[in-house]
């Protein structure tokens, strides 16, 4: 078990009009990125978007599953978990996200 980290599930829409974090529903973060899913461009855009949205360095966002899928899992510092859920107050508690 990795102390200090947690796993967040993400659903990605590629080739969108803008890069945007859309919602957090049932522990799954929905994001849109402008990049196409070619040669890792969309994955890089997702990492950059999450880092900017959460105000953390890109190297603190690690893609651990779903490299070629719309559904991805990223490893994030546990310290930002509460911040993420504060951005979407209508969602369930921070414990809805998966722990690592």
Swiss-Prot record:
Signal peptide: none annotated. SUPFAM superfamilies: YggU-like. Disulfide bonds: none annotated. SMART domains: DUF167. It comes from the Bacteria. GO terms for cellular component: cytoplasm. InterPro entries: DUF167, YggU-like_sf. Gene3D superfamilies: YggU-like. NCBIfam families: DUF167 family protein, PRK00647.1. PANTHER family: UPF0235 PROTEIN C15ORF40. Belongs to the UPF0235 family. This is UPF0235 protein TC_0667.
């Amino acid at each position: 078990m990795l102390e200090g980290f947690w796993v967040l599930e993400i659903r990605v829409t590629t080739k969108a009009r803008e890069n945007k974090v859309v919602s957090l529903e049932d522990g799954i973060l929905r994001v849109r990125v402008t990049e196409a899913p070619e040669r890792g461009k969309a994955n890089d855009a997702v990492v950059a978007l999450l880092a900017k949205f959460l105000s953390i360095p890109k190297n603190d966002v690690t893609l651990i599953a779903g490299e070629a899928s719309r559904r991805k899992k990223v490893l994030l510092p546990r310290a930002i978990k509460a911040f993420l859920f504060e951005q979407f107050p209508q969602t369930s508690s921070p414990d809805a996200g998966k722990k690592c």
